[in-house]
């Protein structure tokens, strides 16, 4: 039951429609797979669509359509259901044909024709100020899987990581590294609570000392702290205390730049490269690859931020207030106007984001997809507003949101905070449960739904663990084929019409729906549909495996069942690969 079956059914309905209402022959025909097994293989609401223009009752129209439906070996049964839906049950041969198609196409089964659409997909884009954490991991798994699905569906995908290397957070990381470095030389400066606290900062400081000895030392505590306001006691959480801590940090950054001179750029670059390199390695080990790493700093170096803001000014969308430049984002649906350039002349993060999206548009992609954390939901109107203000089509930009993943260990939530240094890193998670469990569990839900990640379940070797359950189905087929010991070429001669019991036909139908699933998952930005499909396919295979023998005495039936099992193995492997999960031959 493949996409071809759907095309053929559509053609049959079109012919029937021409017979009863030629003037409506071009009406779009929608065929869907019923959610309940007893409602056939496909259903259409065409009669309900036509009821009003034809002034007929839907059920009456459904009966008329079926009466005019051309005869076809594709259809085994039809029925009118409910208010006027038409259900179709396909002939067994239409379902088993999918097995032959899978064996013929192999790993290419389900791949869509190249559609000429170029897609720029930006994801993860975490500040390179510390190790990637489990929240970044979900965005990475979702983005990588979506990219794979879009590519498999026929698009040309560029996977891009935006490096936030030009903002204040990088200055804080550089300062944090330098202060830890100075401490190695005995300079006991109180470490700011709002600097980066993790052990990785100490590791970077040690690496900097090992490579450059005392090149960045030789300063006094008084020099480093010059002009910095005192730090309030840790217990104070009020706004004034927060402002004092931030002012203290900013003065230390200014002092570091002044004292180090050109060497500050080296320390800044050292910290950036250490963290960026660590993040790249982490992602590569996770099976997440990028085609392009785009530097925020390059937007300033090439003058694109200046140009973007100047263009907004030229178009009348920027005004001056209190010495700052504001973008009129309220004119484009935002809740308030946004600063693009502060009174001190420094651009905001928003200004560089505008320039970055202008760059994306100028590169000529057909579609631009940003994957953001769900906490950035309010950012969408201002970015799309800026795009529209630049005279560009905002609808070209699509934003997919990813909710946070919450880890549970022994039934307890695991806490995390990147600025306090107490966080669960992606690397730690991968080492605990493995890459496969991480990649699969991260896409088990829609990206914009909260995800509770059960560590104990992810590590268990049981049918309750979905990734284990799916991989075990693949390994089971491999074991059966090894016992058989025949050649794969023999399977193409299998008499597929011998596959006739309910479980076998259900498996065939599931396989046949894979190409359509790929297109739907790509259109909906929904790799979780692949995960759901894998769980269903594995469940149907295990049910069949437990009920029937593969290696029966009858050679023809044995070959037919082995052909079906091999087709199941292929689709399992293909779908798992799209999610970045391995397909083991034994378990």
From Swiss-Prot:
Pfam families: Arg_tRNA_synt_N, DALR_1, tRNA-synt_1d. A motif ('HIGH' region) lies at residues 126-136. It is found in: Cytoplasm. Transmembrane segments: none annotated. It catalyses: tRNA(Arg) + L-arginine + ATP = L-arginyl-tRNA(Arg) + AMP + diphosphate. One of its GO terms (biological process) is arginyl-tRNA aminoacylation. GO terms for cellular component: cytoplasm. The keyword Cytoplasm applies. Disulfide bonds: none annotated. InterPro entries: aa-tRNA-synth_I_CS (IPR001412), Arg-tRNA-ligase (IPR001278), Arg-tRNA-synth_N (IPR005148), Arg-tRNA-synth_N_sf (IPR036695), ArgRS_core (IPR035684), DALR_anticod-bd (IPR008909), Rossmann-like_a/b/a_fold (IPR014729), tRNAsynth_Ia_anticodon-bd (IPR009080). Its EC number is 6.1.1.19. The keyword Ligase applies. Keywords: Aminoacyl-tRNA synthetase, ATP-binding, Cytoplasm, Ligase, Nucleotide-binding, Protein biosynthesis. HAMAP family: Arg_tRNA_synth. NCBIfam families: argS. Belongs to the class-I aminoacyl-tRNA synthetase family. This is Arginine--tRNA ligase. The gene is argS.
């Amino acid at each position: 039951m493949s996409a071809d079956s759907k095309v053929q059914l559509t053609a049959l309905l079109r012919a029937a429609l021409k017979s009863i209402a030629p003037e409506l022959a071009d009406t779009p025909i929608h065929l869907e797979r019923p959610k309940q097994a007893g409602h056939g293989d496909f259903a259409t609401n065409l009669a309900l669509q036509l009821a009003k223009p034809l002034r007929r009752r839907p059920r009456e129209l459904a009966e008329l359509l079926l009466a005019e439906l051309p005869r076809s070996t594709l259809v085994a049964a039809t029925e009118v259901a409910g208010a006027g839906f038409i259900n179709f049950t396909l002939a067994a041969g239409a379902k088993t044909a999918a097995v032959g198609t899978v064996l013929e196409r192999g790993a290419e089964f389900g791949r869509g024709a190249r559609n000429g659409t170029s897609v720029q997909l930006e994801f993860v884009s975490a500040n390179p100020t510390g190790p990637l954490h489990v929240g970044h991991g979900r965005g990475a798994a979702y983005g990588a899987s979506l990219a794979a699905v879009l590519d498999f569906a026929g698009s040309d995908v560029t996977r891009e990581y935006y490096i936030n290397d030009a903002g204040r957070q990088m200055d804080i990381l550089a300062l944090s590294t330098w202060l830890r470095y100075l401490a190695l030389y005995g300079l006991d400066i109180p470490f700011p609570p709002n600097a980066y606290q993790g052990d990785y900062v100490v590791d970077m400081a040690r690496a900097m000392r090992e490579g450059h000895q005392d090149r960045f030392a030789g300063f006094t505590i008084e020099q480093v702290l010059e002009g910095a306001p005192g730090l309030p006691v840790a217990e104070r959480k009020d706004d004034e205390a927060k402002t004092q801590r931030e002012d203290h940090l900013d003065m230390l950054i200014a002092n570091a730049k002044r004292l180090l001179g050109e060497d500050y750029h080296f320390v800044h670059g050292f910290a950036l490269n250490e963290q960026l390199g660590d993040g790249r390695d982490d992602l590569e080990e996770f099976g997440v690859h990028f085609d392009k790493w785009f530097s925020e700093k390059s937007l300033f170096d090439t003058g694109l931020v200046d140009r973007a803001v100047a263009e907004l000014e030229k178009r009348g969308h920027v005004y001056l207030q209190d010495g700052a430049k504001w973008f009129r984002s309220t004119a484009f649906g935002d809740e308030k106007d946004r600063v693009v350039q502060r009174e001190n002349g420094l651009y905001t993060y928003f200004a560089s984001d505008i320039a970055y999206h202008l760059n994306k548009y100028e590169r000529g992609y057909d579609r631009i997809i940003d994957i953001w954390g769900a906490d950035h939901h309010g950012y969408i109107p201002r970015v799309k507003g800026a795009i529209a203000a630049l005279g560009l089509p905002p609808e070209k930009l699509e934003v997919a949101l990813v909710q946070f993943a919450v880890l549970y260990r022994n039934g307890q939530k695991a806490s995390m905070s990147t600025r306090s240094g107490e966080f669960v890193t992606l690397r730690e998670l991968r080492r605990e449960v493995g890459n496969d469990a991480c990649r699969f569990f991260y896409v088990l839900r829609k990206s914009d739904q909260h995800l509770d990640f059960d560590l104990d379940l992810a590590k268990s070797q049981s049918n309750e663990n979905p990734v284990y359950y799916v991989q075990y189905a693949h390994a089971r087929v491999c074991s059966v084929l090894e016992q058989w010991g025949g050649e794969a070429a023999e399977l193409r001669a299998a008499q597929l019409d011998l596959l006739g019991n309910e479980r076998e036909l259900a498996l065939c139908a599931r396989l046949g729906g894979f190409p359509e699933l790929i297109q739907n998952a790509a259109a909906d930005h929904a790799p979780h549909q692949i995960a759901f499909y894998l769980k269903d396919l594995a469940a149907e295979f295990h049910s069949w495996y437990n009920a029937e023998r593969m290696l029966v005495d009858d050679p023809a039936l044995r070959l037919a069942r082995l052909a079906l099992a091999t087709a199941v193995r292929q689709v399992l492997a293909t779908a798992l690969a799209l999610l970045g999960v391995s397909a083991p031959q034994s378990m």
